[in-house]
Amino acid sequence: MGSVSAGERGDRRDYNGVMTLTSVLPSLRRTIPDPLRPAKWPEYTHPTTDDVIIAGVSLSRLVELCETPCVHTADALVPGSHSKPALRADASVVVVTVEGVHAGDAGERVVLIDAELTRVVALWEETRLLGRVSTAAARVAVVLGGADGGTPSARGHACLPADLREGDLLAIPCRGAVCLHDVRLSA
């Protein structure tokens, strides 16, 4: 039995079923960032309205230096520990570029990204827009990785702004240490 998404329910809850100020009033995203779940992100992660900072590293700036896809890895947090770092665990964030947004065969919104995420444990429900502030309501989308002319793969579901467009950046947290060769499309 599948779960019902926020968009299918027609209410203002996010993908996780949580109602936040920014999901009720998306215009607030201009002044306050969407909340994130700290245990799903690396240690010392905090959001801004248009970026995510991890241990002092701006993911938007990382993209300027490295292009996409790019990866940032740091210590993971112990779930339920109020931000206590895990001694022997890592967490990563993969930053990708949206290569296209279109309607799928069943009418669902499909987002194509410039990375292959089949070899990583992506936490799709925490995916965030980087580089710009969107005041559009969030809707569930199917995210497909690896669309480099081959068959798209790494299907995930993420709650993303309705005005998502080609060229937008997405930050996707992942469990464990992710290497760039794990997510880069083969040439």
For the regions a protein language model found, what residue spans apply to each?
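Charged (often Lys/Glu-rich) extended helix/loop segments that serve as interaction or gating elements
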Residues: 21, 57-58, 63, 83-187
